[in-house]
Amino acid sequence: MSEKIKVGILGATGMVGQRFVTLLENHPWFELVTLAASAHSAGKTYEEAIGGRWKMETPMPEFVKNMVVKNVADVEDVVKNVDFVFSAVNMPKAEIRTIEEEYAKTETPVVSNNSAHRWTPDVPMGVPEINPEHYEVIEHQRKRLGTTHGFIAVKPNCSIQAYTPALAAWKEFEPREVIVSTYQAISGAGKTFNDWPEMVGNIIPFISGEEEKSEKEPLKVFGRVDEEKGEIVPFDGPLKITSQCIRVPVLNGHTATVFINFGKNPTKEELVDRLVNYTSKASELGLPHAPKQFIQYLTDDDRPQVKKDVDYEGGMGVSIGRLREDSIFDWKFVGLAHNTLRGAAGGALESAEMLKALGYITKK
């Protein structure tokens, strides 16, 4: 068996960083060797740095407890023994943009869960099941950065994961106007009910920045690589998306209710067929975290439900249900995705697996 690729986590003490830690335990391709966080955590063991703030459902893995946390600002020290890093740092966006480029320029690929570089034109915003061809833009990005190995790749916002896969499956029917309302779990804010008690029995009808991301990010996901410009050009067809994003008292799982018009006139049978028979390069390549079936279609009127369906395909699959004709729009449906697995650390990990399979992430 070939030697595993060594990986570090930037922002290892936050909720997404903790999720990366749990996902990387016994990973078949990657070995977690470095943890980095703020100066406040640097120099402590990971267990000391976390203190009582471990937020995962499973206990902290033994292999990380005594790892000494490095200062994320000490770039040269952090990259010493790693082949690439996951970024889940909690900083102002301008600082994230700067530090992620600093890491990339050390010839260390950065796979980021952050939004800071999502609209950098030559940074791919990948969903392995939908747009793996976007990773081709990395060669253009490397020229800009002056690197031969280093680059930045990002994943899209957690809010779009519950409906964008359906739009991708229905691409041939030309989605036009889409109205989406998302009902988003508190873990998306890095919280649990223990540290956000006011969310118990409550709904907050505003999540800063989420509506813009929910409307615009699918357009980059559905865009194309312009080889002349060396960048990703967002989809410029007739697709328009408007959204409302609401925080609800659920721990994990973002639900979306969606109304949609098409340029063509698909039947329900055609729509369901495209969902359940959706295939992708991710499953063909056998990526460790790629779901066997990306999208499941549920026929019961009361599905998808968070309690029953959020962990579909280990939290990496997407559940669609309640597909029916609408009196104003053409069709409507409900989608569900796990926001910290498919929508955050799990999606970033699968992206790294795709980048490794395509030869962009290698041992240094």
Describe the residue ranges of each PLM region.
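Charged docking surfaces used in two-component/phosphorelay signaling
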Residues: 187-364
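N-terminal Rossmann-like NAD(P) cofactor-binding subdomain of oxidoreductases
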Residues: 2-206, 240, 323-327, 349-364
